[in-house]
Amino acid sequence: MENISDLWNSALKELEKKVSKPSYETWLKSTTAHNLKKDVLTITAPNEFARDWLESHYSELISETLYDLTGAKLAIRFIIPQSQAEEDIDLPPVKPNPAQDDSAHLPQSMLNPKYTFDTFVIGSGNRFAHAASLAVAEAPAKAYNPLFIYGGVGLGKTHLMHAIGHYVIEHNPNAKVVYLSSEKFTNEFINSIRDNKAVDFRNKYRNVDVLLIDDIQFLAGKEQTQEEFFHTFNALHEESKQIVISSDRPPKEIPTLEDRLRSRFEWGLITDITPPDLETRIAILRKKAKAEGLDIPNEVMLYIANQIDSNIRELEGALIRVVAYSSLINKDINADLAAEALKDIIPNSKPKIISIYDIQKAVGDVYQVKLEDFKAKKRTKSVAFPRQIAMYLSRELTDSSLPKIGEEFGGRDHTTVIHAHEKISKLLKTDTQLQKQVEEINGILK
């Protein structure tokens, strides 16, 4: 086995790809490998809080990553600096992942126990993908086969794939379910050729009931692996076995992917997942806090949700970073503390250019007004007042002229825009509820 420091550095590089940036920066980056004795890898964490968190949240992922790198089933122990001198004491290590047992052809325990349909937060950006995944889980190979889910990093594709696997196994314990990444498929295929075990490899993946394969875009350019996966796909599909595939883009946009594979990916259902809206981001944070037994003020939830809008991993990682920071400096969690905790991971980006459309959408989200109603002739208070707020913000946050603003609101006269701006400006001086609503809208627009 390679030098222990080199091994751990290699593991950290892989772990950095698998967790959010905040999680990596907070929990993993500062760890070091202490020693390796009798198949037990001892990792040094910076403090007790980090050690306990790593043990409860990352030991399984670390075991899996090390197994992928070395092929060895290593147990994991976490220590803190002052306990290094005592590392020879026979303390019970974290048990290696049972999925690493070579006798288990079907690594069902590779499924993350936290990734179920019950823990998935449904929002406008993932509702259809969730419904399709549930339909596939309830009736494998009868609903959509294959199911192709695509979207950006950390949006929930892997969560849905694991949820499908859990559901199938729960309702049919004898089902053969395999989850793996396309990278692992490629590595195992290459190893099978090198070791003259191609038949074993094919039997392993062509005799399953459900194949869940993640990040299929990494097959691009790998001609031999694509050839092998093509035949694996055909074998499973012909036997009415379910195939679920994920990617960061739709099949037609994956470069150097063979047309015959592309067409097969399009046989079933293709569904996408988009970044969560503010409401969904807050719901995700609340669910994460509840799952971890954390009491987080609403103002902190809103702050984090406004600052982190890229993906769910970053969002949850930011929440945990805030909690860790609060614990380490022994201060209560509030918005100011959250800002301090996240200052290093929230990039100082250029000021966002806000359009009138952005404003209409944000105001519409807060006041439950359809976009078309901003341009309509409706004068009911439920529409007219939000329209005036949107006009006010368009005047405040964009460089658009009065006539241009009026045009974007159904061709209204510039005097209407002036009146709306004056009215809302006056109300904001005394109306605390309106102040909060406008603040919420501004948060969405950041």
From Swiss-Prot:
Binding-site residues, ATP: G154, G156, K157, T158
SUPFAM superfamilies tied to this protein: P-loop containing nucleoside triphosphate hydrolases (SSF52540), TrpR-like (SSF48295)
Subcellular compartments: Cytoplasm
Cellular component aspect of the GO annotation: cytoplasm; plasma membrane
Region of interest (Domain I, interacts with DnaA modulators), ranges: 1-81
InterPro entries listed in its UniProt record: AAA+_ATPase, Chromosome_initiator_DnaA, Chromosome_initiator_DnaA-like, Chromosome_initiator_DnaA_CS, DnaA_C, DnaA_dom, DnaA_N_dom, DnaA_N_sf
Signal peptide: none
Domain IV, binds dsDNA as annotated region, ranges: 327-446
Presence of keyword NAD: no
Family: Belongs to the DnaA family.
Protein name: Chromosomal replication initiator protein DnaA
Spans annotated as Domain II: 81-109
Record remark: domains: Domain I is involved in oligomerization and binding regulators, domain II is flexibile and of varying length in different bacteria, domain III forms the AAA+ region, while domain IV binds dsDNA.
Subunit organization: Oligomerizes as a right-handed, spiral filament on DNA at oriC.
Annotated PANTHER family: CHROMOSOMAL REPLICATION INITIATOR PROTEIN DNAA
Chief location bin: cytoplasm
Annotated region described as Domain III, AAA+ region, given as residue ranges: 110-326
Natural source organism: Bacillus cereus (strain ATCC 14579 / DSM 31 / CCUG 7414 / JCM 2152 / NBRC 15305 / NCIMB 9373 / NCTC 2599 / NRRL B-3711)
Gene giving rise to this polypeptide: dnaA
Coiled coil feature spans: none
Summary of the function given for this chain in its UniProt record: Plays an essential role in the initiation and regulation of chromosomal replication. ATP-DnaA binds to the origin of replication (oriC) to initiate formation of the DNA replication initiation complex once per cell cycle. Binds the DnaA box (a 9 base pair repeat at the origin) and separates the double-stranded (ds)DNA. Forms a right-handed helical filament on oriC DNA; dsDNA binds to the exterior of the filament while single-stranded (ss)DNA is stabiized in the filament's interior.
Pfam family, one: DnaA_N
PROSITE patterns from the UniProt entry: DNAA (PS01008)
GO BP of this protein: DNA replication; DNA replication initiation; regulation of DNA replication
